[in-house]
Amino acid sequence: MLKRFAFATLVLAVSEVSFACAAVRAETGTEAWLRYGRLDEKTARQYRELPTTVAELGNSEILKSAQTELILAIRGTLGRTLAIGKRNANEPAIILGTLPEIQKYFSDLHAPNLVADGFWIEFDARHNLIVTAQNERGVLYATFALARKIALGESISNINEVRNPSAPIRWVDQWDNLDGTIERGYAGRSIFFDDGKILADNPRINAYARILASVGINGCNINNVNANPHLLDDVNIPQLAEIATKFRKWGIELSISVNLSSPKTIGGLETFDPLDPRVAEWWQIKVNALYAAIPDFGGFVVKADSEGQLGPSFYGRTPADAANVIARALKPHHGIVFYRAFVYDHHLDWRNPKNDRAKAAYDNFHPLDGQFDDNVIIQIKLGPIDFQAREPVSPLLGALQKTNEAIELQVTQEYTGQQRHLCFLIPMWKEVLDFDLHANRASSPVKEILTGKTFRRSINGYVAVVNVGTDKNWLGHPLAMSNLYGYARLAWDPNLSAEEIAREWTALTFSRDPDVAGTISGMLLSSWRTYELYTGPLGMQTLTDITGSHYGPNIESSEENGWGQWHRADVRGVGMDRSVATGTGYAGQYSPPVAKSYESSETTPDDLLTFFHHVPYTYVLHSGKTVIQHIYDSHYEGAERAAEYAKTWQTLKGKFDDERYAKTLALLEYQAGHAIVWRDAICEYFLKLSGIPDAKGRAGHHVGRIEAESMELSRYTTIDVRPWENASGGKAIECLAADGCSAKFKFEGQPGKYEIDIQYFDLKNGDGRYRVFVADKLVDEWIASFQLPATKIGGDSSGRHRSPGVQINRGDEIRIEGIPDKEDHAAFDYIEIIPQLRH
């Protein structure tokens, strides 16, 4: 029987709504994909029959968030303000409520099969728009889904949408420190901490929670996995409770990372042995205190026995011993332990060819399968090393049949450009999730394992390291939030395509204009492959500075140390033998069908060849190229593709706001220059090591390049750059004179318009200044203040400045003046004079 509703026509006046609308007008990226831009009249016309009133059945913070959000969305996209319903009557309405509440009034409703957080949206016979779910969080997700459909201009006239999440765990991690820094964060300081204090009243916490909820994220861990034990101090619990309150209205559970040594370091015990009853009691008391303040506290994340973090091995105990003692304290409160499988020895003997970091996660956790309590989740990185641009799927994902597991992805671009390079990671994650591990000799794609159905596990799922910061657009690069959006959409539905996700995000974040949506989504979809091409192809890993900033080329930093990210390049060939027959045996950790494909170089995909096999430079790939020629070709192709991004972006000028356009263009131009740094470093290194020339004559030959050290120098001094491949010719020049230095040469080419490209170094501890003169006329100047991570001259500090459209005549003197600042010595590497093509 259908009951009737009456609705008061109340006007909503909510400060959050006003703030959000102002942020949309500013177009800084603060609103992410929740801009709710106004639809054109033709598109908006299809929503004329949308009810003008909204009612929530219930009285909870989450439902109020849903109602407020829908009003905001309709106001933004359609220019209407929904009335808030209060009583029974005849007029149709948008009705928000859980299924039990909805069915009190709509007893003839035939509800679909919904799981926790799943939702249903449909029009009933009286044109009420029913927005319902099994729980209140699901109603919120349904509301965001409805708002998204309208913002995308999709029809809802015959909507009957049922959506269940693929997995119950859809969490994000922040690696924020109490001092306000963020480990592997590239977008400002922490929104949660500063100077040892918790920023519980920071309004960005609420804004972040709203963004997460809009794409179905249901948990957030707010502090670094390299955890400071003092976060557990009693004085911090009230502030953590305030953050949990902000999260709660958006359906997000708060969790924190804990240090296993806490019972000893802050608890007054002389031990943290997980099998000591006093340690178990300490954890129980601490957990009880947390739940007294935060009844819906989510649980703990644990990193132990890894990279200097103490763990159970200190007492001869296992990860299961450590996880279970905490899990048992959490169990009465329904809390969870996320125990990271990132456990390895970073003091491996590199001289032993059988040592292999890739084997560590499987070796440490597979023997313990079935020994973890049922509220423990093993958090497993997608690959066996460390978030590289390309690595195989972790075999551990298919090996834990009696243990809950979650895949760990990384939104923050630690090894994939640190939000200075465009790198849309969804295509990579799709490959991982679609990969068939053939567990139990049956078809078992990773995405099916993560549902929990493959091995009948109850709390499997997804975790991503995000590391948003105080930058207005959350992740620094205006295009980087596409990775957070894409992660969350895949965690909900891993069968979505990368193309669908890219187009959705672009339309919501920038514009539904087909030119904008097509252009930006096209750039996104090609960017991961582009980044891989100019960094580390063929499974070599990223070839970056692994012992320092994790940014820029530094090939030998991977070798001859204990970190285990070896590529084993020598004068004969490159790659690490991980076969069972002759290598480390890593390939044997996979199920037989997968292991067989990786055991032989002939059946290993080219993209992973050097990860599994040491091969000669003359080895012929499936593509028909030799390994060495592929190295040359891929790096030149990648740099060329990166250069096209800036040109493509310029076709969008005027199609959306100037601020995001200009910031993105500057980053894409920087990426184009840094891709050349990568190209030259890798090609020159392997040219020298292999002694095999580039068949196309590019590597080692740079037409139009003038080395800085060959110019006429005034107070500039020549320096050797280490590693040598990070500067053209292995040398650069720097200025130590406070009032500046200069370098000049005479141009001997044909007169005309040229682009002057200067490869310079930008150090973070100072802002060096540069000026370019042609025939004593100032043609360009800039300050090196791009906030690169570098503290010395090298691959992570090298950038390229372009001065286009400069008229140069034969005999003109070209002079570069540099003025140092602090530790930035206005250094540069070379100049290239490139003819400006007429169009």
PLM ranges: what are they?
Residues 8-18:
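Bacterial N-terminal signal peptides
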Residues 22-126, 157:
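Acidic, contiguous N-terminal accessory segments
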Residues 45-61, 189-193, 223-226, 621-628:
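Acidic/histidine-rich, surface-exposed loop or edge segments in extracytoplasmic proteins
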Residues 59-69, 73, 103, 108-301, ...:
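Feature activates predominantly on carbohydrate-active enzymes
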Residues 82-83, 195, 199, 234, ...:
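Catalytic-core regions of glycoside hydrolase
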Residues 99, 134-136, 177, 217, ...:
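An acidic- and aromatic-residue-enriched active-site/binding cleft used to recognize and process polar
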Residues 443-702:
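Catalytic domains of carbohydrate-active enzymes that cleave complex glycans
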Residues 693-839:
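Extracytoplasmic
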